[in-house]
């Protein structure tokens, strides 16, 4: 499936565009962009790199190191955005609050934002920060696709049970905007499914492909 997905070839041409500390430093609000968010240490950088087949996000050993919105151009009208890691205990509270203010401003005001990938560690899902992201997405009626990362850390049955449990809660609270799946960067589990979501949000699928995905 991934060989037929146009997002793969496009991501191979991705290039760093700009880093922004706040919304007014972002690129012009036009075209389409998809953002990647996640609590620090939830595997956001690994997921982004695996989905794009590129080393777009530096996988750091120090969670929370990325403090800026990092934009990557796929072509003249499509972008990916690596949002700051959030929630790590060693980050000072004022800095956490600063990140939250600017994340909320970005999510609520960015017209070109087509959707958000939210990374949740399958062993520690639905943290306060995860719920906050879901609330922001719902308030803006913005599609949000949850990747339950590090699924390889659990046995298959346990991972499925965790998915079902979280899915029930997500559907009850944020079902109008949120979808979710299992994901493992090392095992490449769930990569094709997530790439299809990414391609759809960026307007890369034709009508036949979208109908197939919805069937």
From Swiss-Prot:
Organism annotation: Pseudomonas aeruginosa (strain UCBPP-PA14)
Residues binding GTP: 38-45, 64-68, 82-85, 149-152, 182-185
GO MF annotation, one: GTP binding
InterPro entries: G_ENGB_dom, GTP-bd, GTP-bd_ribosome_bio_YsxC, P-loop_NTPase
Name of the protein this chain belongs to: Probable GTP-binding protein EngB
Entry function: Necessary for normal cell division and for the maintenance of normal septation.
Gene3D superfamilies for the chain: P-loop containing nucleotide triphosphate hydrolases
Top-level taxon of origin: Bacteria
Family designation: Belongs to the TRAFAC class TrmE-Era-EngA-EngB-Septin-like GTPase superfamily. EngB GTPase family.
